[in-house]
Amino acid sequence: MTMNNQRDFNKENKDNLERKYAYHFDYDVIHPLIMRSFKPFFKDGNVLELGSFEGKFTIHLQECFADITCIEASSDAVRKAKDVVSNGVEFIEGAFETVQLKRRFDNIIMTHVLEHVENPNIVLSKIRTEWLAKGGRLFLACPNANADSRRIAVKMGKITHN
């Protein structure tokens, strides 16, 4: 695969037992921890969430921001997200590499997303040159494949890869 438009994002996001464990751990443990870490550094203004998936982290963002835009490549995930978040959140369906935005953002958030992007350099460049407002902040969280919690989950058979 050379370009995002050849990927089937809906197929990639289909639930299986392995992902259900990972998602519930993210929703119940990791998301609140990330919010506690990020929140003191949020700037007033708007926020762009890259890779909103089914809106579970977006719900936390609604506690801090009135102006939220989310980009998600999976149409199935966007549909589910619209069911769980309150009105006022703008969803844009598309791959980060190809989406064009008409404005800049004071806060940009990527939680457990960058590791799924085909070309992270392109996305990070777009964030810096096109999407992040002057003085804006990028909040980024990537999972650690060697973390004890992940290795324990592999040993328990909850996930099959490290």
Regions found by a protein language model. Name each.
Residues 23, 161-162:
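Long, acidic, serine/threonine- and proline-rich low-complexity intrinsically disordered regions
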Residues 82, 118, 153:
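A short local structural element in Rossmann-fold oxidoreductases
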Residues 47, 132, 153:
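Short glycine- and Lys/Arg-enriched binding-loop motifs that mark or flank ligand-binding interfaces
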Residues 139-161:
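Conserved class I S-adenosyl-L-methionine
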Residues 121-137:
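A short glycine-rich, Lys/Arg-flanked "PGG" loop and its adjoining helix->strand segment in the class I
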Residues 1-103, 107-111, 121-124, 140:
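Conserved N-terminal segment of class I S-adenosyl-L-methionine
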Residues 112-116:
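Short catalytic micro-motifs in class I SAM-dependent methyltransferases
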